[in-house]
């Protein structure tokens, strides 16, 4: 039974008080509580409580560092707030054990572990090493305080770690709740905004991104436009408020933007998923996917530095649609399905969709388009208020409904000026859903106002590997008037219908055409050719090309139709296997004469080298030959018109034939051209090798003067009628 003390004044000599106080002395000494209660019901501090107060006082006054002393040198600790450096770990330690028996003596060359241990009631670390260890732990980030919405000075941890999430604003993902207004404050604040928690976030409004915003849409996150909202999901502040250009905006991550187009009714700019205009530096991508946009997934305009890497589409119209001015663009890895063009560059547009400003597309580098399905992979078109300058498009794969790359005119886009364009590494198959289309099409389609509808200074097409067996690989057309000043096609497909075609008379011109480096198997079709020309080609250069034709009924190196024009052609290292003719002019006379220069040319089989219909052709040959033929068809044939030969052709058969008043002759000089001289129109001073043994001059080297052919070995002569 507990002893009941008296209320006698102090000092009391009552045995009851004596016994009670004995218990209180034990409580004072041994209790871990901070206080005990005396017989008058008053509280006093225990030894533990006194220690606590002393510790708080020492903390308030700070620690006393024993300068020059360490565990290595040894030291004497006289007070609880004195600390000693352990050089082994760079940590300061204080002694929390008893000082009842005097100071704590630390021998030289000791450690905290060897002089009492590290634990409460012994040595404990009080320096920054403990803090560093705690912060370095996986849970260390939880030790750093952060206030959402607070502005931290640059260079501080708070500044570096600051970002915002919907959850910080009380917003959770939901497939039913519309939370657009709930995040207005978050987007107004800008900075780093992170949709990290997977789920659907439904907005009924456009979220406006301020300058400096870095928006992260994480994996499993879908930002969806509510039914009937009829607005873009994202705009930037400059565009939304017609204000100064935004410095930097980023939209990144592998989440999804769902325009929900099946449940929107608007047309025009409201049908875009995102509109971003007036930005110095814009970065979009990271695997982000746009679905269900009724018009462009991304409409981007007036950007100085555009970076678009890793865009994914499943949408009804264009994927990434760019309008000028855009001064530097780095575009990589676009993929998916687009109802129209996956990547479009338009200077101007239809009125409902046009936010462009006068200016150029310059320094544009696009690579890696993977078309699961696209109407076209890339489209380039303009209205004359700017130019396309220094463009490279590379690496297009998959399937396109129509052409892979298209440069063309339209009702509102009547003048396209391209300064420098490179298109390379094209593997996508055009015309995948039906009618065959060219891999690359340049076509003004009859739209224009003045001058040229399409004018291209330099076009380089390299590594064109698209397999197309029913249409020209590169198709040049238009009835208004278009020109390509310099076109190079380097690296040709293995199989083809035709490589390049100029498909309209009088309205199309190519100043300089070069086609090179390929070993092609052509379809057995009358229009199969390396070049098909109905218009004007000033210089036609074909180099290092092997042409494999199925038969001698079809196929040609150059198919020249009616009144087309070719001023000069240079063919170097060209191999023709079978085929109908190398140079094949049909229908009616060409406009003007042509120089055809053949170097290291081989015609293998019964196909002809050149035939004209009512036209004038000069053929200069160097190291040329015709092999594996029977002479059933002559190498050269003039159906009306005239062919002038010079140089060297190795063959064992007569090389010339004519009808309909056609003329074949040589230039003056000695030529290694085997032929029947009775078929060769005489030109004074010309020398060839006669193969017609029935002529009075006999076979062999002959020279003509005033229509008299003289055998240079026998002296025998033959007088020609032509």
Predicted regions and their residues:
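Gly/Ser/Thr/Ala-enriched C-terminal appendages of enzymes
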Residues: 413-499, 503-512, 523
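Non-transmembrane elongated oligomeric "stalk/shaft" segments that connect baseplates/barrels to distal
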Residues: 1-195, 215
């Amino acid at each position: 039974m507990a002893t009941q003390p008296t209320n006698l004044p102090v000092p009391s000599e009552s045995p009851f008080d004596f016994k009670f106080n004995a218990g209180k002395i034990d409580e004072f000494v041994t209790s871990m509580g901070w206080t005990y209660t005396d017989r008058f019901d008053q509280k006093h501090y225990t030894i533990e409580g006194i220690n606590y107060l002393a510790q708080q006082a020492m903390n308030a006054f700070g620690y006393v560092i024993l300068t020059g002393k360490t565990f290595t040198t040894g030291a004497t600790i006289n007070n609880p707030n004195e600390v000693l450096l352990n050089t082994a770990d760079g940590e300061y330690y204080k002694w929390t054990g008893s000082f009842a028996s005097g100071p704590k003596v630390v021998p030289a060359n000791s450690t905290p572990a060897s002089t009492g241990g590290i634990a409460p009631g012994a040595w404990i670390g009080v320096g920054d090493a403990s803090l560093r260890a705690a912060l370095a732990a996986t849970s260390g980030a939880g030790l750093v305080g952060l206030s959402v919405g607070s502005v931290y000075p640059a260079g501080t941890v708070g500044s570096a770690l600051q970002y915002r999430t919907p959850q910080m604003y009380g917003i959770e993902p939901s497939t039913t709740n519309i939370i657009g207004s709930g995040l207005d404050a978050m987007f107004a604040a800008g900075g780093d905004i992170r949709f990290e928690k997977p789920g659907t976030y439904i907005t009924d409004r456009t979220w406006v991104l301020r300058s400096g915003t870095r928006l992260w849409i994480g994996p499993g996150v879908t930002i969806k436009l509510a039914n009937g909202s009829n607005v873009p999901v994202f705009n930037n502040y400059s565009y939304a408020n017609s204000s100064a250009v935004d410095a930097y905006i980023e939209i990144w991550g592998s989440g999804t933007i769902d325009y929900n187009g099946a449940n929107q009714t608007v047309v025009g700019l409201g049908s875009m998923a995102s509109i971003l205009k007036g930005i110095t530096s814009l970065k979009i991508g990271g695997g982000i996917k746009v679905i269900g946009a009724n018009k462009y997934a991304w409409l981007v305009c007036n950007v100085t530095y555009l970076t678009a890497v890793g865009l994914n589409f499943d949408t009804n119209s264009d994927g990434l649609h760019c309008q000028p001015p855009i001064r530097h663009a780095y575009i990589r890895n676009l993929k998916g399905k687009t109802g129209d063009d996956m990547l479009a560059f338009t200077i101007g547009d239809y009125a409902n969709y046009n936010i462009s400003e006068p200016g150029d597309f310059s320094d544009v580098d696009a690579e890696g388009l993977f078309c699961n399905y696209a109407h076209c992979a890339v489209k380039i078109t303009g209205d004359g208020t700017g130019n396309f300058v220094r463009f490279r498009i590379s690496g297009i794969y998959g399937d396109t409904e129509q052409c892979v790359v298209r440069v063309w005119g339209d009702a509102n886009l009547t003048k396209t000026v391209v300064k420098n364009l490179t298109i390379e590494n094209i593997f996508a198959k055009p015309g995948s859903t039906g009618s065959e289309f060219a891999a690359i099409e340049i076509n003004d389609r009859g739209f224009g106002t003045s001058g040229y509808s399409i004018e291209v200074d330099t076009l380089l097409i390299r590594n064109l590997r698209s397999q197309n067996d029913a249409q020209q690989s590169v198709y040049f057309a238009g009835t208004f008037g278009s020109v390509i000043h310099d076109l190079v096609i380097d690296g040709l497909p293995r199989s083809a219908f035709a490589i390049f075609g100029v498909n309209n008379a009088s309205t199309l011109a190519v100043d300089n055409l070069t086609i090179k480096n390929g070993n092609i198997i052509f379809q057995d079709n009358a229009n199969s050719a390396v070049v098909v020309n109905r218009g004007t080609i000033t210089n036609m250069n074909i180099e290092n090309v092997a042409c494999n034709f199925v038969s001698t009924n079809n196929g040609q190196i150059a198919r020249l139709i009616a009144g087309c024009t070719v001023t000069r052609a240079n063919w170097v290292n060209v191999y023709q296997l079978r085929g109908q003719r190398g140079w094949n002019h049909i229908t009616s006379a060409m406009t003007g004469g042509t120089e055809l220069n053949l170097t290291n040319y081989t015609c293998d089989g019964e196909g002809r080298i050149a035939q004209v219909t009512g036209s004038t052709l000069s053929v200069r040959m160097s190291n040329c030959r015709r092999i594996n033929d029977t002479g059933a068809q002559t190498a050269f044939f003039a159906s009306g018109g005239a062919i002038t030969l010079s140089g060297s052709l190795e063959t064992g058969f007569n090389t010339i034939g004519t009808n309909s008043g056609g003329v074949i002759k040589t230039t003056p000089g000695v030529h290694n051209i085997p032929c029947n001289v009775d078929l060769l129109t005489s030109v004074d001073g010309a020398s060839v090798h006669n193969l017609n043994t029935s002529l009075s001059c006999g076979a062999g080297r002959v020279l003509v003067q005033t229509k008299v052919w003289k055998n240079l070995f026998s002296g025998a002569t033959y007088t020609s009628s032509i």
